[in-house]
Amino acid sequence: MIPQRILMKFFDFHIQGRDHDSSLRLLLEASRLGYQGGVLVYPSERYPDLKSDLESLRENPELQDFEIARGVMINASDPRDMRRSVNKFRKKADVIYVSGGNLKVNRAACESRRVDVLSAPYTSRRDPGINHVLAREAARNNVAVELPLADVIGSWLKVRARVLEQFREILKLHRKFGFPLLLTSRASSIYDLRTPGDIMNLAECFGMESSEAEESLTSTPASILEDSGNRHLLIAEGVRLLPES
């Protein structure tokens, strides 16, 4: 698991890794832009690559002051598939992401205490992908909702307007129910990365206050990383497995 040094300021909580060299370029650029850490996210089927790449990256002297967490993205076809994958990777990854869009999967993710992040629940939808019921469950289970700004930066006209409106609706639910909210780059190349200041300015386009945007880049990521090590012990509300002595 990640080193116990989570006293960072800005964290890009979703950097898409493909291989060692491209991941290195992304992490170095994120550091240059003012981040003190990032989550390197690989698809679940490529976890062995993530494990080997991360070991090498953490030993790179240019990244010694940059915290790197290990994230796994689960693309599930149904809730059963999601739960099976979450159980498989919960002890292996620092952060478990569930790719959103399918309403049943969105709900299962919000109801699971073993999921860290529901990513882009609005994907391929005209609605935000979560409602009052799911927002309440996400808050109860401390499941964060990710708003990747790549969906705004990489879209045009009507699509961009729709995504911004979906962000606004999710922000309203966040303010009402209090589930964790993340702003990320979801960068797959160095040209997708933005400075923390740029991200906070962009967040104003869908009504985020500067304090809310800063929290989504700082204290919320730190809290998720701090809690993730105990997620595998949570099996039901109020029920926690005791670690072996």
From Swiss-Prot:
It is found in: Cytoplasm. One of its GO terms (molecular function) is ribonuclease P activity. It is an enzyme of class 3 (hydrolase). Signal peptide: none annotated. It catalyses: Endonucleolytic cleavage of RNA, removing 5'-extranucleotides from tRNA precursor. InterPro entries: Pol/histidinol_Pase-like, RNase_P_comp-3_arc, RNase_P_p30. The keyword tRNA processing applies. One of its GO terms (biological process) is tRNA 5'-leader removal. Keywords: Cytoplasm, Endonuclease, Hydrolase, Nuclease, tRNA processing. Its EC number is 3.1.26.5. Disulfide bonds: none annotated. Part of ribonuclease P, a protein complex that generates mature tRNA molecules by cleaving their 5'-ends. Belongs to the eukaryotic/archaeal RNase P protein component 3 family. Consists of a catalytic RNA component and at least 4-5 protein subunits. This is Ribonuclease P protein component 3. It comes from Methanothermobacter thermautotrophicus (strain ATCC 29096 / DSM 1053 / JCM 10044 / NBRC 100330 / Delta H) (Methanobacterium thermoautotrophicum). The gene is rnp3.
